[in-house]
């Protein structure tokens, strides 16, 4: 570290040449300092010896450490935009500070919004967790925190099934029951205007969960609707570089879960293993090598009648609906998703809102709701009866049928103006009301 090196200079030291690098001649104090090395001076005609760098403790990082930048992400493409400003033709430059052209100098500047804490009302007693669902999730999470002899445990658990069946909500209940603090991601974060940004975000969120585990807090990475962000939904969607990199990053993490590095740095120390839970509706749209058995354990979630009744009891637990009425409601709409019953409960409050609107006046709604000194309106909990629930349930089913039956887009393409768009209303008798 303290070794000196020689520099050959053609001109004598007494008449130094003009340096194009420094832009000016060396004065005499500079020359005398340059030819002095560890208290020993050389003649003016001898060759220069450069000053040796002072001793630096390599075990401590200081402001003078030339490698300090390795701990930060200096390879960010947004910083490259900043670095290249003024160095390339203006034709290829976007205005700085506009949209995505905001310089982000470090990955650590992305303050994570992924951590989510749960505080449900009567979480364990009031909400139902399906036994099969809980068994699969608890076993997978536990296996990933254990050291099993000669066993390769898949890092990723893929939970897939029909829409609105409560996959994400059931996961949140299990996390809360196990005392897990998940790091959350959604499908919308798996695409970006900058190539490589989603893959970097996955690694960053994974390392955040790893840091929580280091501190003694059980954690996992939870990605909602993976197929919507990284899957191919037919010919109408474009397969981008980010789709490829998201799939490749998840494959790499599944193969090397204890060696996940952030861009711009490399840490030889192993990070704790973090199980990954993903949800989706159709995993056949994902890259096939990602969902192979060694990397992803797959679980198809189709709630049974018992599961549907149990979840619906939790939905109506504060409304005083009798248990036999919940069973009747579930059996009346057997083909509906669990989310249907949550929407059904929300419909019951329509009458209360409608009554408040008539009392307040339509012209006063904005002032009462947005800029009111009295605060937002409060409602007494309406009495929910099985007759009212069945009535609203059939209304929701009718709306679903209308969407499937009245396909106006096809009519607009085939016929002029409205075509026969009002024909459906005439048949149902609601057109002349």
Curated annotation (Swiss-Prot):
Transmembrane spans: none
Localization in the cell: Plastid, Chloroplast stroma
Feature: compositional bias, Polar residues: 1-20
GO MF annotation, one: ribulose-1,5-bisphosphate carboxylase/oxygenase activator activity
Transit peptide location on this chain: 1-53
One GO location term (cellular component): chloroplast stroma
Sequence positions that bind ATP: 161-168
Function: Activation of RuBisCO (ribulose-1,5-bisphosphate carboxylase/oxygenase; EC 4.1.1.39) involves the ATP-dependent carboxylation of the epsilon-amino group of lysine leading to a carbamate structure.
Family: Belongs to the RuBisCO activase family.
PANTHER family recorded: PTHR32429, RIBULOSE BISPHOSPHATE CARBOXYLASE_OXYGENASE ACTIVASE, CHLOROPLASTIC
Stated name of the protein: Ribulose bisphosphate carboxylase/oxygenase activase, chloroplastic
Gene: RCA1
């Amino acid at each position: 570290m303290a070794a000196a090196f020689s520099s050959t200079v053609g001109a004598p030291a007494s008449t130094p040449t003009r340096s194009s690098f420094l832009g000016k001649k060396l004065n005499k104090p500079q020359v005398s300092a340059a030819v002095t090395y560890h208290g020993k001076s050389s003649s003016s005609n001898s060759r220069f010896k450069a000053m040796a760098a002072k001793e630096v403790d390599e075990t401590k990082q200081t402001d003078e450490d030339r490698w300090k930048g390795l701990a930060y992400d200096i390879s960010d493409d947004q910083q490259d935009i900043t670095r290249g400003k003024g160095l390339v033709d203006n034709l290829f430059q976007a205005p700085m500070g506009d949209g995505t052209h905001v310089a982000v100098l470090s990955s650590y500047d992305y303050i994570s919004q992924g951590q989510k804490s749960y505080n449900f009302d009567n979480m364990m007693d009031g909400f139902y967790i399906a036994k099969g669902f809980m068994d699969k999730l608890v076993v997978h999470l536990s296996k990933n925190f254990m050291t099993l002899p000669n066993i390769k445990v898949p890092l990723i658990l893929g939970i897939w099934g029909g829409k609105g069946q409560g996959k994400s909500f059931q996961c949140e209940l299990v996390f809360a029951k196990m005392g897990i603090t998940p790091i959350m991601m959604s499908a919308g974060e798996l695409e970006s205007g900058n190539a490589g940004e989603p893959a970097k975000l996955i690694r960053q969120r994974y390392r955040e969960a790893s840091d929580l585990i280091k501190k003694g807090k059980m954690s996992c990475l939870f990605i909602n609707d993976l197929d919507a962000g990284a899957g191919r939904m037919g010919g109408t969607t474009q397969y981008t570089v980010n789709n490829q990199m998201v799939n490749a990053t998840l494959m790499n993490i599944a193969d090397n879960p204890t060696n996940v590095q952030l861009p711009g740095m490399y840490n030889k120390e192993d990070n704790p293993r973090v199980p990954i839970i993903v949800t989706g509706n159709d995993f056949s749209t994902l890259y096939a090598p990602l969902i192979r058995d060694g990397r992803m354990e797959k679980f198809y979630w189709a709630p049974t009648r018992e599961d549907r009744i149990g979840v619906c009891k939790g939905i109506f637990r504060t409304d005083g609906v009798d248990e036999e009425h919940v069973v009747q409601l579930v059996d009346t709409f057997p083909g509906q998703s669990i989310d249907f019953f949550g929407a059904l409960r929300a419909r019951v409050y329509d009458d209360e809102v409608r009554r408040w609107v008539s009392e307040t006046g339509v012209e006063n709604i904005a002032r009462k709701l947005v800029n009111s000194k009295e605060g937002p309106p409060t409602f007494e909990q309406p009495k929910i009866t099985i007759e009212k629930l069945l009535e609203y349930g059939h209304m929701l089913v009718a709306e679903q049928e209308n969407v499937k039956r009245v396909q106006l887009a096809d009519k607009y393409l085939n016929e002029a103006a409205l075509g026969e768009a009002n024909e459906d209303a005439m048949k149902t008798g609601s057109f002349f009301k």
